[in-house]
Amino acid sequence: MFSNKFLSIIKSNLVRSFSESKCLLQESKSNLFKLRKTTGYALNKCKEALEKNHGNVDEATKWLNEQAQKEGWDKAEKVKNRQTKQGTLVLYADRANNQATIVELNCETDFVARNEKFLDLSSNLAKSVLVNSNVSESRVLLGREDLIKLQYLNESKTIGDQVALSIGNLGENMSIRRAVIYKLKEDQILGWYMHGSSADSLNNCHFGKYGSLVNFNMSQRNENYKPFDLGRQLAQHIVGMKPLSLGEMPKELPTTTSETIKIDDNETRLLYQEFLMKPNTRVLDFLNENHVLINDFVRLECGEVVESEETK
């Protein structure tokens, strides 16, 4: 017969063991849901990650990210020949530093192009391009091969890595096609417009199918227009009227407002087009009235065929 003292010891050990097991189970469950919440990966994947890493959340997170990246690249390789005719333009402007970018990200379907995860990716790509592209010129156009090598945000991976990861998550082929970057001097003014962008932007970015950036100077203060509003109107005109070039200022401007000026509806030079915001007035006359000089502009359309692609 066991003594009462011996039975008491066994009982105490069993209670302690049960209590410790319960605590471990609660901790394990807590870690599982914590990992699920912070990473967004499936519950079964999170459970596998914790089992492989002895319950260490940090190591499990690292393992999950590595697995997701590998699966993303594998998926990207499988779908790389699928056409990506849908997508979005995303505009990110940093007014404090007088710079902005428009990035085009393509996907297979309009359904994914409107997905919040896709738009979130687009906005982070635009921020990465503007912050991490080491450009010195006022205007630079980058293609896919240059873009995928850039650092993604402040993380230890590239834009190419992040796009591949998103391909794995969303299940469609994607491609960061091009980006235009404006980094202007202090005396220059930056204007921008994105057609179709909602008032509630995501991550301070604007999305749409048509976008424009314009670089201009004002020789004196304007009582009618604030620089930002003027830049927006000029960029909006560029999106709507599709100019192909700036054109040259004429040597002489009309001396009176009574002079009749013929405006060609098919004009492709920006300066000689009818200004969208002021009918029967050429852009150059509007600029002259408001002491404005346009230095440069760019207009992008999502999915448009560009010259370099036509020659392929």
Enumerate the language-model features and the residues they cover.
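N-terminal chloroplast transit peptides
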Residues: 1-15
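N-terminal assembly/interaction segments in proteins that build large macromolecular machines
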Residues: 2, 19-312
